[in-house]
Design a protein with these regions (language model features):
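Short Lys/Arg-rich basic patches
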Residues: 1-31, 81-88, 95-98
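Residue-level detector of alpha-helical secondary structure
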Residues: 6-7, 38, 75-78
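Surface-exposed, Lys/Arg-rich phosphate-binding patches that contact polyanionic backbones
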Residues: 16-18, 23, 31-50, 54
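Short, basic amphipathic alpha-helical segments that act as recognition/interaction helices
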Residues: 44-71
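Short, positively charged interaction helices/loops
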Residues: 61-98
Length: 98
C-alpha cells in the first residue's frame, strides 16, 4: 500500500495503479456548476474526469468527497461564478430554451 494525500485526506492505495478503461461521454450540466468543477479540478491539479470520478466514488460509499479546506475553496469558487444552486435544487432544474 502507498499512503498519499488527496483533498487533504490521507489515502491508502495499492502499490500499483489500477488500470481502468475510460470512455468519452457527453453530458450536459448547468453552466455555472461546470465552471466551478473545472476551476476546482485546475486548483487541485487534476482532470475534470478524475475529479468527477472521485466525487462519484465517494458518494457511492456515502462518504464526503471534500475536506473542510476544499469546501472553503469551493465556496469561493461558487461566489466567483455566481453558483447559488444547492442540493435542494437537484432534480428540479429545467433547461432554458434558446
Amino acid at each position: 500500500m502507498v499512503v498519499h494525500w488527496y483533498n487533504n485526506h490521507m489515502v491508502q492505495t495499492p502499490k500499483h495503479a489500477i488500470v481502468v478503461e475510460r470512455i468519452q461521454t457527453g453530458v450536459r450540466m448547468e453552466k455555472r456548476l461546470l465552471k466551478v468543477l473545472k476551476a476546482l479540478a485546475e486548483l487541485k491539479d487534476m482532470t475534470l474526469g478524475d475529479l468527477l470520478e472521485g466525487i462519484v466514488l465517494h458518494a457511492f460509499e456515502g462518504k464526503a468527497p471534500f475536506s473542510s479546506q476544499t469546501l472553503k475553496e469551493i465556496e469561493k469558487l461558487r461566489e466567483i461564478y455566481g453558483l447559488r444552486l444547492t442540493a435542494a435544487d437537484s432534480h428540479q432544474l429545467k433547461e432554458q430554451k434558446r
